[in-house]
Regions:
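Conserved short beta-strand elements that form part of the metal-binding/catalytic scaffold
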Residues: 2-3, 42-80, 132-140, 200-232, ...
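Solvent-exposed alpha-helices and their adjacent loops that cap or buttress functional pockets
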Residues: 171-172, 215
Length: 340
């Protein structure tokens, strides 16, 4: 019988993993990918026939490689998809601990030893049970003096003599989380638990939300097991400053002609606002803001999958970036709340 909660029996290593430092896509939609990521709001760093390199505001990197690049591990699924996730760590001590933890795993590899010791340029990698290359290196993300717009909930006035912003487009702050379909949920959860990931919430036997440290955002990784046995990338989420930037980014992508999968909307489980688009690099891509922040006092909850659990509210098909209404709704000169 499969253990429904494998991580409960595995000690969580107190490792200093900071979050996602880089991801690598492989695609055969090369020029479309370049245009998409520019519209998405990433900063271009390099563009060669073999690789595109982009970054977020805090320096997290997005690499795009050719779909037949021999340096990449085999894909989890056909077509454009994610081939590698790089996690940033605090220091050499963390890398040494991870090297010991991963040394028995399939595909274990250490690059760039310095004087036979692990240093700042070292990459430690292995394949997770689904075959995704998981890499650890010292974090190169930058600290930022950014703040989202405060809100004025009842009884707690935080924004005075200042209007909320209206964004013309988004400029993602960081790579927030990755989500994969798996047919090995128990194995995958146990693998990441040994690396220090902590379970935040779960769909028993169906899915698990995990964060890379006890204190941090609701999840850095979500693993979802479907009845169909589908394997591969679901989506990558990019964190923006606030709900207003979710709207501004989504409306800009709409004006650029990109297709919404779902959104905007709000997830009850993490409290985050979202907007999902179809991505020529593979899977879906999400603007994400205002997720819950957890500590080691948090107790993981259990949910049964369902539409009201996934979304408190959501707009199917998005919002037209020109009319600011759902695409099938004609514009007029009246107020949206005007009686008809």
């Amino acid at each position: 019988m499969t253990d429904p909660n494998p991580s409960a029996h595995i000690p969580h290593s107190p490792l200093g993993i900071e979050g996602i430092a880089a991801i690598t896509y492989a695609t055969d939609r090369w020029d479309e990918a370049r245009r998409f990521l520019a519209d998405w709001g990433l900063t271009p760093l390099a563009d060669t026939p073999e690789q595109q390199l982009w970054e977020t505001q805090n320096g997290a990197q997005v690499l795009v490689r050719r779909i037949d690049d021999p340096s990449l591990p085999p894909p989890m699924e056909p077509g454009p998809t994610l081939r590698e996730v790089v996690w940033g760590v605090h220091d050499d001590a963390t890398l040494n601990l991870l090297a010991k933890t991963l040394s028995s795993q399939r595909g274990y590899w250490v690059e760039s030893y310095e004087n036979n010791s692990i240093g700042a340029n070292t990459r430690i990698s292995a394949l997770d049970p689904q075959g995704l290359r998981v890499v650890f290196r010292q974090s190169t993300k930058r600290a930022l003096a950014l703040q989202g717009s405060p809100s004025n909930p009842w009884g707690q006035i935080q924004r005075v003599d200042t209007p909320s912003p209206v964004y013309e487009r988004a400029q993602p702050v960081e790579i927030g989380h990755v989500v994969f379909f798996t047919d090995r949920l128990a194995e995958m959860e146990a693998f990441y638990a040994t690396l220090g990931f902590v379970t935040s919430d779960r769909y028993p036997g169906r899915g698990v939300f995990m964060r890379c440290a006890a204190q941090g955002g609701h999840h850095d990784l979500f693993l979802l097991q479907l009845p169909t046995g589908q394997v591969g990338l679901n989506h990558v989420a990019f964190t923006v400053r606030d709900i207003h930037e979710v709207f501004g980014g989504g409306l800009h992508m709409s004006r650029c002609g990109w297709k919404t999968q779902l959104g905007p909307g709000r997830h009850p489980i993490s409290s985050a606002y979202f907007w999902y688009f179809e991505n020529p690099c593979g899977g879906l891509i999400e603007y994400n803001a205002d997720e819950d922040h957890l500590t080691d006092a948090w107790q993981a909850r259990e949910f049964q999958p369902g539409p009201t659990v996934f979304a408190e509210w959501a707009i199917d098909g998005g919002i037209d970036g020109h009319t600011r209404r759902q695409p099938q709704v004609a514009t007029s000169g009246g107020f949206l709340t005007e009686k008809r």
